[in-house]
Structures are given as structure tokens and as C-alpha cells.
């Protein structure tokens, strides 16, 4: 049997476009991303459009190509605004019927054209199916409905059609045609299955109604020269044919109902409609336009179908007329009075969402090409959703923590499960400390022994005392030598008294000694604290070192119990072994029941924590960005509704947590009742005193060692502070020692120069006096001579006949060639070169702050007074306003005013600089007290000839007196510093070095080391 021809819609054609460049520009300008990262995605989208242009119109592959491109356009529209203002791409499509081109920049136009082609492909695919086979018939039935659904989507979503094929009137006509053909296909299946006549009549009536709607639209579009005229002929023929079928099958149904008169009337109507259809089919053109998608034999097929149907109707009409005339004699109603045939719809438009029902849409459309690009609006919505998730997780976490806290508090109140150990008799055998006790022991063992620290402190204190004693002796020795030289030379010894210059140094020494005394008292307090807790600390240290912490705790508890007079003296029998038979449950059974409930509670807690963990993990991995992107256009209207809908996925976890809380409450009530019954048992009450005694002993032991540990922490802090203090104090003492040595060395050098000056002055005086006496003797001899001398000098006027003595000269003849001419400068403080000794480092007294001390107070961690001393590289000593100038060190060029000095404490650096750390300003010209006249500079030594040596006996005495008063004196048998015999004829080592350098022409301090 030849199947009836079906109308299929032609496809729209389009011109080529380029997606790549516009998309890359937009990604660069709007999203600020590198467009080359999306080069492959842009090329893929471009290739999809090329493939879509060549899609086959009668296959599922062509449909899938179109739908894949359309799906990517939908996803693209959520991220990229393709229009005339943003991504400007001209889409050119040709009308499917008139072939007129239409160009727009709107992505909606592109999508509507794609959907139109999908509908056209579906209609072509349905029209070409072999409906004589069941599979082909089902495919045609589904495809016609799907085509109608796609046309319906265009009609509902694209209101302003730019071309005639997309206009609402045209699309509605196409919907009617597709639905009518789907109804016809379904009718063919029912006729082939020989269904009841009444059903077939209703299906035919519905098909006729759909064709009637199509005729109206096709007639209008033919008038507008949009559709081909052959389409109007086909729908008109099928309209009459379907109406004739409806009347025919309804007549058969009336015959079955013994309504022969009505049946005859319907057959007469069917005969007239069949004749009209056959007439139109015979007038169908033999050649059809290519754009109509109809075959050339379409007219012959329709003519044959209508002819066969007309013959069938005529035959049945003759049969019924004969039977009615002979048997039934029922009246035949008029055509106008015949009731219309009821309609039964069997076809409806399939929505786009159901087009691929039962299939993997992701497989057809492919992955989202631009999934890595998330619009800002979607990101903001995703952040809001994340906050909603966080609120939910926080609420459930708080609920779980509350439930766990309630369980812990209840068990702690009931003293479970620890109380069960007592009842089972295992408490004495396994008394274990808590983790805090173990931590205390390990911490005590990890620290350095306090005894070693005390030994270190004692050693440091002795060393500091030795340094202070040495410095004090040096100052005393220097002062003693200075005063001895003053006593020997009287007014000629013009060196300043040492007592006026060593006030600051001696004050530092005194204050350092006082600070050591205060520190010793603090050390004593620390030692007292150690002795008070030494036993407990030693026990804790040894237990941690030997891994016997548990044994220590158990011994301490047993010892505490023995020393407690209120504790039971004898061990009571084990409750599990006691024999009480009062007819009730045994203690073992009651304990077992309590343990079972505790196990159930533990499982509830474990399950609750696991559910919470699963909830957190699921919430963390939950990402609805794609859902938000798909709903981007409508998210503003129902954002909260969407969030609540998505949060429902966590509802099962929430319900499980609520159930766990209810189960815990029930188990806690059961546990309370069961455990109270156990405690009320007379066999259990007999053991209460023993349990309480153990608890008291355990608490007492923990408190004792806790107190010892706290004292240990205080002791350790005090000892560490003391170590730091003694370390800083030793540095200060060593700095003071170097300052004292520098002072003494400077005083020695100053004394040596002064001694040289005195010796030179005395030698000059002796030489002048001898010359004067010789002149006087010569004059006397001349007067006593009997021979007059013509060369006798004339007496000087105004001299009374007495010759004028030669003036005294204190300068040697060759002194003008020596570098000692620098001594003629009047400023005493600047007549020494600025070359520091080997042991002295240049120092800026105003620009360097001393290192702050560590705090040290073992008893209260407070501060204990302690002194401060200038650093070892200090080059000036502070003097008060009423003091005489001090002898400067070799590199000092000025004196600095003293600053207030107060006794400091351990770790108090501010005491060293009471003025807020501001450096003291030195006086460039040096400080000279009123009435002080510096001594005159010593003259240089006389010129030396080859192998000539000049001896100054006085220097030996001064050099020896600094170490031993007997060294260097005339007649003394002791040797000098270099092992030579002391005497007036041998210069000291410094004088030898001075002579070797040409009378001090090099460095006048070169012999300083000899005076140390």
C-alpha cells in the first residue's frame, strides 16, 4: 500500500560569519583575560556553525548538528552580549520560502533561524519515514510533534519576526500542518491495528479539524506568495479526505448501534466529501515546485487513495440502503440534522526540553565551550549562595557541638565511665595520671637543672667581684704613686690629684658591688624556693627520664591514702565477687547494662560527627555556577527560591543530625535511671567511702605536683633572668676594667712626660748656674791679676760694675728640629695625637646606646637595682661641674659633663640614660676649673750624637714606683721591669724607646706599654 504524501518545511540558508575575532576582543576588553587561552573554544564554535550550514535535512545527524550549535548559542548568550552595541556580528539568513536575505546583529535572530531549521529537518525526517513499518511510523509520529514543538517555541519566544518565514501567522500555520500530519500518522496506525470504529471516527474528526486550521493559514500565505499553491491543494484534499473518513467510521459505529438511518446519512455525507477530495486530487498538478518538498507523484497517490476510499463508501452505502429498505425501515435524517463527529486529539507539540527525552543532552550538545568564563552577576549570586551554605553548616556545627557538650557534661556529672572502674575493682590496680601531670614531668626534665644554673651564677658573681677588686687596686696604686711623686717633687709635680678624677670610676665600682649584694639576696630567695620544692621536682625529673611517670603517680596516691586517717585501713572485697542474693539483678548485670548504654552513646556521637563531616564536604564541593548561568536571565526574580531549592539537597544530613540528637536524649535518660539504680544498690553504697578516699588522694597528689610545677616555672624564669643579668653585669664590669686600665695608662703617660720635663728643667738650671760661677771667677781673677788687660770688657751701664748674668735657657740647642714643637700649644687637652692604644677602640660616646639588661627578680620577677658602667670603647670620663679636670686618655680631645647616675635594677636599661637616651654633648675646648693652670710643656731632649746616650734617673723611680716603690731608687738592689739592675745610670724601657725614635719625633705614646 502506498502511503499518503506529507508536507515538509524547506530549510533556511545562511551566509558565512566569523566568531573568533569578535569573541577574542570582548574577552580581552571586558573580562580582562588572555584571549589566546580561548582560541580553541572560539575555533570550535566557528566550526560548529560551518557544520550546521551543511546539515542534512532528512537525518538525525543533521538535527543533532543543528541542536549542538543551538545549545552552544544558548550557553554563549549567558556570557557574551551579541548585539549591535557589544559583540557586533552580522547574521545573514535567507527566507525559507521567498529566499529573500535578512541581516541582523541580534543573537536571537540567529537562534530563531537555527530552531526553524531544526523544525524543518524534523518535518523532512518524518515525511521520509517508511510508515508501513512500525519503527518508521513511530519516528514519523514523534518527529512531526517535535517539529510542531520547535515551531511553538519560535512562536512564543520570538515576537518580532524580521522575515516572513518567522512571522507568527506563518509559524502558526506550520504548527497546524505538523500536528495534522502527526494526527494522520497516528490514525494510520490505528486503522492498521483495526481499532474500534468509534475511536477511528474521533481520530479522523480531529485530523480534519487540524487540516481545516491549516487550510486557512496556507490560503493566506499562498495569497501573499509565501507558500506554494500545491501545499494548499494537499491540505484541502486531506481536509475532505479526513472528514469523509470521520463520517465513514462513525457510520460504521452507528450501524453497530442499529442506527441504520443515521448511518446511511453519514455515508451520504462521506460520499460527497470523498468525491470532492478525489476531484481535487485528479486536478493536482503533475509537476511540483522544488521548494515545496513534494514528489511529482503526489497527485497520483492522493487520487488513488481518495478513489479507493470513495469506492468503499459507495459500497457500504448501497449495502445499508438495501438492508434498511428490506428490514429496518429507519428514516434517514437530513444532512443538516446529523450530529458532528466527536474529536479525539492524539498529537500535541513536544517541548524543546523533551525533544531528546531519555537521551544524554550533554552528549549531543557537547561541553560548555566557555565554562571557564563566569559572568560577574553569576559570581555575585554564587557568593550569596555560598554564604547561605555557610550559615547552614555553622548552624549544624553548633548543634553538634551543643549535643556533644551536653553529653560530656552529663557523663561528667555522673562520673562515668570512671566510676565503673571502682565498681569493677580495677581502680587501685590502674591509677593513672592525666595528661597534664605527664606534661609537667616532661617539662621539668627537659629544662636545665637549677643546681647547675646556681653554680653558673656563683661563678659569674666571683668573676665580677674579682674584676671589681682588680680595678679598685689599680686605682689605689695609681693614686699612691701620684701622691708619692707629688711628695718628692713638691710644687714641680703639677699633675692633678687622682682622687678628683676617679670619682666616677670609684662610684661605678661601689654601685656594682651594691648591685652584686642585692643580686646575692635575690639568688638566696631563688635558692629558698628551690629547697622548698626540691623533692617534688627531683621526683618528676627522674620519673620522666626513666619513663616511670605512672609509677610515680601511683606511689604518691598510695602514700597519700596511707597518710590520710579517714581513708579505710583495709581493702574491702571486690563487688563483683561479693555474694549478695536479694533476688534482684546482680551488680555485674547492672554494670554491663550501663556499659551498653555508654557504647550506644559513643556510637551516636561518632555517627553524628561523621554526618557533620559529610555535610561539610558536600557543601564545600557544591557548585551551582552552571545552574546560575542557565538561569541568569530569570535569577533576579526568584534568586532566594532557587537557593532554597538547591539547599534542599542537604536536608537528609540535617534530618540525620536531628535524629541523632533525639536518640542521645533518650539514651541519656535511660543511662541516668540505670546508673542511679546501680548506685542505690546496698552492695554499691558499701564501697562509696573507698571511692571517695581514692578521689581525694588523687586530687591531693595532683594539686601538690601542680603547685610544685608552678613554683618550678617561677624559679626557671627567675634563674634565666639571673643568667642574663650576670652576663650583662660581667660585660659592664669588663667595660669598667678597660676604662680603669685606660685611665691608669693615660695617667702613667702623663706622669712620664711631666717627670721628663722636671728632669730637663733641673739639668738646665744646673748648667746656667755653673756658667755664671765660672764668669764670676774669671772676673775675680782678672781683678786680682797684676797685668792690665787691654781687652777687658767695659762695665755695663746701670749694673754697678757687675756683669749681667746670661739668661737661663730651658730649650736644648737642637730642639727646634724635633716634632716636640707641638707641645708649645697652650691647650693641654689637645697636645696629644689622636692615636688610640692597642687595647682601646675608638668610640662615639653620644651615638651608641648600650644593650638593655634582662629583667631579673627571682621572688617577684621585679627589678633589682644594678649599676652601669661605660662601655670598653668609651674615650671620655664624665666629671661634675665642681671637679677638677681629669687626665684624658690618649685619644680623648675633650671632657664631657657628667650626667645623673642612679642605682639601676636588673634589666633596666633606661637607668643608664636617664635623659631618655639622648647623648651627652662634649665640650670641644675641654673643661678647665677656675684657678687651674696647666703645667708648661716639657722641652725636648738635647741632640744626640752617634752612640750617645742620655740618662734620666728620675724616670726610673717613677716607672718603678707604679709597681714597686723600691724599684729604681738610688742604692736599691731590686731590678726594674725588664730585669735590669735599678739605678740612675740605666733608662727605663720607655726612655730607651723614646731615644731610639729620635727624641719622640715619632709617636710620643710609643712607650706607653712600658708603664702598664
From Swiss-Prot:
Protein's UniProt keywords contain Coiled coil: yes
Keywords, comma-separated and alphabetical: Coiled coil, Cytoplasm, Endosome, Protein transport, Transport
Positions with biased composition (Low complexity): 844-857, 914-930
SMART domains cross-referenced by the UniProt entry: BRO1
Primary site of residence: cytoplasm
Biased composition (Polar residues): 827-842, 892-913
PROSITE patterns in the cross-refs: BRO1 (PS51180)
Span of domain BRO1: 5-407
Biased composition (Pro residues): 931-945
Keyword ATP-binding: no
Region (Disordered): 558-578, 784-812, 827-1012
GO cellular component, one term: endosome
Regions of compositional bias (Gly residues) in chain numbering: 970-985
Coiled-coil intervals, chain numbering: 301-330, 719-775
InterPro entries in the record: ALIX_V_dom, BRO1_dom, BRO1_sf
Compartments (UniProt record): Cytoplasm; Endosome
UniProt record, GO biological process: protein transport to vacuole involved in ubiquitin-dependent protein catabolic process via the multivesicular body sorting pathway
Protein family according to the UniProt entry: Belongs to the BRO1 family.
Function according to Swiss-Prot or TrEMBL: Involved in concentration and sorting of cargo proteins of the multivesicular body (MVB) for incorporation into intralumenal vesicles.
Protein name, as recorded: Vacuolar protein-sorting protein bro-1
Amino acid at each position: 500500500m502506498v502511503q499518503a504524501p506529507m508536507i515538509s518545511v524547506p530549510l533556511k540558508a545562511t551566509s558565512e560569519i566569523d566568531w573568533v575575532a569578535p569573541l577574542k576582543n570582548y574577552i580581552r576588553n571586558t573580562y580582562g583575560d588572555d584571549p589566546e587561552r580561548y582560541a580553541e573554544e572560539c575555533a570550535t564554535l566557528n566550526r560548529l556553525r560551518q557544520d550546521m550550514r551543511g546539515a542534512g535535512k532528512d537525518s538525525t545527524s543533521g538535527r543533532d548538528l543543528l541542536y549542538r550549535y543551538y545549545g552552544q548559542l544558548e550557553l554563549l548568550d549567558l556570557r557574551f552580549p551579541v548585539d549591535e552595541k557589544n559583540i557586533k556580528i552580522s547574521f545573514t539568513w535567507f527566507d525559507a520560502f521567498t529566499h529573500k536575505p535578512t541581516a541582523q546583529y541580534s543573537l536571537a535572530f540567529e537562534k530563531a533561524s537555527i530552531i526553524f531549521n531544526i523544525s524543518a529537518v524534523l518535518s523532512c525526517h518524518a515525511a521520509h519515514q517508511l510508515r508501513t513499518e512500525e519503527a518508521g511510523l513511530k519516528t514519523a509520529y514523534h518527529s512531526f510533534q517535535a517539529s510542531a514543538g520547535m515551531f511553538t517555541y519560535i512562536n512564543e519566544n520570538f515576537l518580532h519576526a524580521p522575515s516572513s518565514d518567522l512571522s507568527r501567522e506563518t509559524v502558526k500555520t506550520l504548527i497546524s500542518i505538523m500536528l495534522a500530519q502527526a494526527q494522520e500518522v497516528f490514525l494510520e496506525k490505528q486503522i492498521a491495528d483495526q481499532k474500534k470504529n468509534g475511536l477511528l471516527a474521533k481520530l479522523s474528526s480531529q485530523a480534519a479539524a487540524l487540516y481545516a486550521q491549516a487550510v486557512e493559514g496556507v490560503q493566506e500565505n499562498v495569497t501573499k506568495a509565501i507558500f506554494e499553491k500545491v501545499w494548499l491543494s494537499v491540505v484541502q484534499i486531506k481536509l475532505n479526505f479526513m472528514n469523509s473518513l470521520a463520517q465513514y467510521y462513525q457510520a460504521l459505529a452507528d450501524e453497530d448501534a442499529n442506527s441504520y438511518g443515521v448511518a446511511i446519512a453519514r455515508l451520504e455525507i462521506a460520499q460527497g466529501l470523498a468525491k470532492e477530495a478525489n476531484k481535487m486530487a485528479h486536478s493536482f498538478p503533475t509537476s511540483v515546485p522544488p521548494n515545496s518538498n513534494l514528489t511529482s507523484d503526489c497527485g497520483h497517490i492522493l487520487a488513488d487513495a481518495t478513489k479507493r476510499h470513495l469506492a468503499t463508501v459507495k459500497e457500504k452505502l448501497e449495502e445499508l440502503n438495501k438492508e434498511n429498505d428490506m428490514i429496518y425501515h429507519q428514516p434517514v435524517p437530513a444532512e443538516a440534522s446529523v450530529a458532528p463527529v466527536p474529536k479525539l486529539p492524539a498529537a500535541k507539540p513536544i517541548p524543546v526540553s523533551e525533544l531528546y527525552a531519555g537521551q544524554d543532552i550533554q552528549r549531543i550538545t557537547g561541553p560548555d565551550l566557555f565554562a571557564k568564563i563566569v559572568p560577574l552577576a553569576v559570581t555575585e549570586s554564587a557568593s550569596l549562595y555560598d554564604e547561605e551554605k555557610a550559615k547552614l553548616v555553622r548552624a549544624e556545627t553548633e548543634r553538634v557541638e551543643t549535643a556533644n557538650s551536653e553529653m560530656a557534661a552529663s557523663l561528667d556529672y555522673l562520673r562515668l565511665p570512671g566510676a565503673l572502674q571502682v565498681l569493677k575493682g580495677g581502680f587501685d590496680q590502674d591509677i593513672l595520671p592525666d595528661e597534664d601531670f605527664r606534661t609537667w614531668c616532661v617539662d621539668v626534665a627537659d629544662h636545665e637543672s637549677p643546681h647547675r644554673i646556681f653554680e653558673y651564677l656563683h661563678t659569674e658573681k666571683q668573676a665580677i667581684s674579682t674584676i671589681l677588686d682588680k680595678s679598685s687596686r689599680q686605682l689605689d696604686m695609681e693614686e699612691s704613686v701620684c701622691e708619692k711623686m707629688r711628695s718628692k717633687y713638691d710644687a714641680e709635680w703639677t699633675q692633678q690629684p687622682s682622687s678628683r678624677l676617679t670619682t666616677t670610676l670609684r662610684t661605678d665600682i661601689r654601685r656594682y658591688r651594691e648591685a652584686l649584694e642585692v643580686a646575692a639576696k635575690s639568688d638566696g630567695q631563688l635558692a629558698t624556693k628551690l629547697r622548698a620544692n626540691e623533692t617534688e621536682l627531683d621526683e618528676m625529673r627522674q620519673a620522666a627520664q626513666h619513663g616511670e611517670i605512672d609509677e610515680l603517680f601511683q606511689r604518691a596516691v598510695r602514700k597519700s591514702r596511707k597518710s590520710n586517717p579517714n581513708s579505710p585501713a583495709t581493702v574491702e572485697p571486690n563487688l563483683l565477687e561479693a555474694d549478695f542474693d536479694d533476688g534482684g539483678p546482680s551488680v555485674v548485670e547492672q554494670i554491663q547494662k550501663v556499659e551498653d548504654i555508654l557504647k550506644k552513646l559513643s556510637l551516636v556521637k561518632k555517627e553524628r560527627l561523621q554526618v557533620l563531616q559529610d555535610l561539610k564536604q558536600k557543601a564545600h564541593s557544591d557548585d551551582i555556577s552552571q545552574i546560575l548561568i542557565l538561569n541568569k536571565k530569570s535569577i533576579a526574580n526568584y534568586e532566594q527560591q532557587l537557593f532554597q531549592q538547591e539547599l534542599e539537597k542537604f536536608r537528609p544530613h540535617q534530618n540525620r543530625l536531628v535524629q541523632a540528637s533525639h536518640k542521645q536524649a533518650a539514651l541519656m535518660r535511660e543511662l541516668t535511671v540505670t546508673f542511679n539504680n546501680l548506685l542505690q544498690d546496698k552492695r554499691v553504697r558499701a564501697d562509696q567511702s573507698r571511692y571517695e578516699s581514692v578521689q581525694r588522694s588523687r586530687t591531693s597528689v595532683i594539686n601538690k605536683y601542680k603547685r610544685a610545677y608552678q613554683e618550678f616555672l617561677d624559679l626557671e624564669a627567675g634563674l634565666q633572668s639571673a643568667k642574663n643579668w650576670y652576663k650583662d653585669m660581667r660585660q659592664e664590669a669588663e667595660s669598667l676594667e678597660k676604662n680603669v686600665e685606660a685611665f691608669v695608662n693615660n695617667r702613667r703617660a702623663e706622669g712620664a712626660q711631666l717627670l721628663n720635663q722636671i728632669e730637663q728643667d733641673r739639668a738646665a738650671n744646673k748648667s746656667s748656674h755653673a756658667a755664671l760661677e765660672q764668669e764670676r771667677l774669671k772676673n775675680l781673677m782678672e781683678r786680682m791679676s797684676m797685668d792690665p788687660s787691654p781687652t777687658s770688657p767695659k762695665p755695663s751701664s746701670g749694673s754697678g760694675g757687675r756683669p749681667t748674668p746670661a739668661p737661663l735657657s730651658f730649650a736644648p740647642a737642637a730642639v727646634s728640629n724635633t716634632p716636640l714643637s707641638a707641645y708649645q700649644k697652650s691647650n693641654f687637652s689637645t697636645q696629644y695625637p689622636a692615636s688610640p692604644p692597642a687595647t682601646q677602640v675608638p668610640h662615639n660616646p653620644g651615638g651608641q646606646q648600650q644593650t638593655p639588661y634582662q629583667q631579673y627578680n627571682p621572688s617577684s620577677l621585679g627589678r633589682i637595682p644594678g649599676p652601669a658602667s661605660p662601655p670598653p670603647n668609651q674615650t671620655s670620663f664624665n666629671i661634675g661641674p665642681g671637679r677638677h679636670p681629669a687626665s684624658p686618655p690618649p685619644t680623648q680631645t675633650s671632657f664631657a659633663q657628667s650626667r645623673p647616675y642612679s642605682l639601676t635594677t636588673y634589666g633596666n636599661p633606661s637607668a643608664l640614660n636617664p635623659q631618655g637616651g639622648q647623648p651627652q654633648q662634649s665640650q670641644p675646648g675641654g673643661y678647665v676649673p677656675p684657678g687651674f693652670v696647666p703645667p708648661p710643656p716639657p722641652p725636648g731632649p738635647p741632640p744626640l750624637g752617634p752612640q750617645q746616650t742620655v740618662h734620666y734617673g728620675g724616670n726610673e723611680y717613677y716607672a718603678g714606683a707604679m709597681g714597686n716603690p723600691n724599684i729604681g731608687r738610688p742604692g736599691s738592689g731590686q731590678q726594674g721591669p725588664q730585669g735590669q739592675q735599678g739605678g740612675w745610670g740605666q733608662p727605663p724601657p720607655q726612655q730607651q724607646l723614646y731615644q731610639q725614635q729620635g727624641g719622640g719625633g715619632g709617636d710620643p705614646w710609643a712607650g706607653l706599654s712600658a708603664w702598664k
